[in-house]
Amino acid sequence: MAGTGANSQRGQHTAGTPDMAMIGSPRWAAATPSAGLPARFGNFLRRTAARSSTDCRTRRARLFLDRLHPSATDEILDVGGGKGGYLAGILPYRGNVTIADVDPAVLTIAAETYGFGTVQLDGSARFPLADKQYDVVFCSSVIEHITGPRDVIFGIADSAEFAASARAAQANFAGELRRVAKRYFVQTPYKYFPIEPHSFLPFFIVLLPRRWQIRLLDFFGRHWIKTVQADFRLLTIREMRTLFPDAEIVLERYCGLVKSIVAIKA
């Protein structure tokens, strides 16, 4: 494991009080609708989606803090944590937090901005980490993107072949999360929520043959408020129970509908 960056000073907010300035902006909220979509309608969709995402991310942060009780004495790992802004917004300490990601550029930002330790992942089947190395492992909206080697999956147009690749990769990823964690919190969007969260298209996009999915996502990427690659496979509640048999499954709801699934081992 390669830790980088010196420890930063303790933040001003306290655990249990998520910092909205840090966690309240989804990555795509600033996307600009193309000229093919009326600007007013595009802006409305963008604001609505950003608001719902902010609400869910805030409630998720509280659930994480309330159920796992992460502390300054815990070794904490965020798998797929990118630049580290999410945990930086909800945890008041830095020196015991590590961000793991495949992108070295975001790891540099996580280290230099927040003083987090970093682990470079290479996309291989096994994490470069010891068994039960971390007291707490956090992983949000990542496992649905673990569908196989990046240089292979975009060339797969057959639905059954892609599903087989994705199931195997997701099972391995879940096993690695469980292997390195004493306690964990793993969240993923629910397959049957009315709006598919990556494309912001109706959920039936995930039920179409993969060949059609690729074409539609490519088309809407040029004429819609979001651009997304066809690298994801959303999970069901049953699948999450199978992937994390030692966890409690908690359902995040929005407007009464299941929006995300969270596997918690406290």
Q: Residue spans of the language-model regions?
A:
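Conserved S-adenosyl-L-methionine
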Residues: A247-G256
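Conserved class I S-adenosyl-L-methionine
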Residues: R150, A169, R183-R211
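Conserved N-terminal segment of class I S-adenosyl-L-methionine
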Residues: A2-K132, V136-S140, G256-I261
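Short, glycine-/aromatic-enriched active-site segment of Class I SAM-dependent methyltransferases
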Residues: I153-A160, R215-V228
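A short glycine-rich, Lys/Arg-flanked "PGG" loop and its adjoining helix->strand segment in the class I
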Residues: D158-R183
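Helix-to-beta-strand junctions that scaffold the AdoMet/dcAdoMet cofactor pocket
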Residues: I146-T147, A181
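Short alpha-helix
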Residues: K226-D246
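A short beta-strand submotif of the Rossmann-like class I SAM-dependent methyltransferase core
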Residues: C139-V142, G148
